[in-house]
Amino acid sequence: MKKLQASVRSHKKQPANHKRRRTRALSSSQAKPSSLDGLAKQKREELLQASVSPYHLFSDVADVTAFRSNLLSWYDQEKRDLPWRNLAKEEANSDRRAYAVWVSEVMLQQTQVATVIDYYTRWMQKWPKLQDLASASLEEVNQLWSGLGYYSRGRRLQEGARKVVEELGGHMPRTAETLQQLLPGVGRYTAGAIASIAFDQVTGVVDGNVLRVLCRVRAIGADPTSTLVSHHLWNLAQQLVDPARPGDFNQAAMELGATVCTPQRPLCSHCPVQSLCRAYQRVQRGQLSALPGRPDIEECALNTRQCQLCLTSSSPWDPSMGVANFPRKASRRPPREEYSATCVVEQPGAIGGPLVLLVQRPDSGLLAGLWEFPSVTLEPSEQHQHKALLQELQRWCGPLPAIRLQHLGEVIHIFSHIKLTYQVYSLALDQAPASTAPPGARWLTWEEFCNAAVSTAMKKVFRMYEDHRQGTRKGSKRSQVCPPSSRKKPSLGQQVLDTFFQRHIPTDKPNSTTQ
């Protein structure tokens, strides 16, 4: 760390053209706007600069250079060995390289690295090229994606692959702008990640990890979801990205946020850009305030009420939080509550054992195209759920005995914006229904169910049914139909795969003033 700090001090002597370079570092673009949109954008830039203190900027080109150098040196030594990084580095074909990055970035959205590794490996083994994915069926895509969540990601990924093959001659767009414009489901971040990692385009990215790093190094405490703050963060990312190694730089910034500059208990003493971090400096100022003499540490020159990037008066600095004061979490609406009744219908099977009935969800909306047990949506005070569910079952199976419909309990599953409570029922048939399953329905063995394109919520329902059918208590030993990967998540005391890809670092608390 002393070497890293020394590299910052080494930039005190500035060349003769420093003033010109510093001016360039302050602005991401000096181009004269050629349209009304360009003029509007320039006006927004001017208003933003007028309301922002240099405290929240990288005003000195020496700091930009040091940030790049220190971060990349750390990344070269500490980066995790991940399959998508190896593919991006080793693949000579630029289209395959871009495809490999694309798949990883889509899978990593809202999903932990440890979870993605297995899915990514199986995906690339099954569909190593864009053309392979384009020719696959949506059912195959949903089946492999089962359990990963946010299922529209897989569908849009395949839609994008088909567009590249059918409309773009099999060649991926080469820039962040065209990637975002031409490919469905590709937003600004994903486009920038693909363009910088696969094609070396000098473009910055801002994901959740980068956002946290930037908010801390420049002490940005305003709502990170606001248009003004988001615009400022993207400007910072574009200013900082290393022109010689844009892909590595972006991955390094994400890696720093994921492994060192974490949401809770960040490892500040191991941070390669600690000496440039405003949040860390503020913690140090608090710790040194009791010593003789006031430490010379820069602060925001504007009044807090004037600066639109500082912590607000309604949410001031909390010494106990340390650097975790940044970024401040935006208020989130609680997920809306919905209720459903679902039933596991079983009929006697042959060699493969009993069969359960699955029906396919609509092609759009929540869990589009996935398979589930027959279900009906209920009102919270629904008094006749038994009758409503039986009517739904008869739609798929024909006349059924109501007296055999048995209530097993309830399963709660929380999606990103919905808390869904399932009332779980079972119905055992003595023989197969008189009619065959209609379109949109099918009978599967237990083993087939575990490998089908079903949601995690349905696997929870099936586990309740499994436990009840086998007459076992929760936690007792029994044979498992579904493989462990599709069952419960590891407990808090159990190591997850991600831990094997991190260098062991002892926990410290340099971010707290209560040391």
UniProtKB/Swiss-Prot annotation:
Basic residues bias: start-end ranges: 1-24
Active site: 105
Protein's name according to its UniProt entry: Adenine DNA glycosylase
SUPFAM superfamilies recorded: DNA-glycosylase, Nudix
Cofactor binding mode and count: Binds 1 [4Fe-4S] cluster. The cluster does not appear to play a role in catalysis, but is probably involved in the proper positioning of the enzyme along the DNA strand.
Binding site for [4Fe-4S] cluster: 261, 268, 271, 277
GO cellular component: mitochondrion; nucleoplasm
GO molecular function: 4 iron, 4 sulfur cluster binding; DNA binding; DNA N-glycosylase activity; metal ion binding; MutSalpha complex binding; purine-specific mismatch base pair DNA N-glycosylase activity
Coiled coil regions, renumbered to chain: none
Keywords: 4Fe-4S, DNA damage, DNA repair, Glycosidase, Hydrolase, Iron, Iron-sulfur, Metal-binding, Mitochondrion, Nucleus
Tissue specificity note: Expressed in heart, lung, liver, intestine, brain and thymus.
Annotated site residue numbers, Transition state stabilizer: 207
Region described as Disordered: 1-38, 468-494
Domain Nudix hydrolase, chain residue ranges per copy: 335-466
Similarity section: Belongs to the Nth/MutY family.
Gene expressing this chain: Mutyh
E.C. number: 3.2.2.31
EC class (word): hydrolase
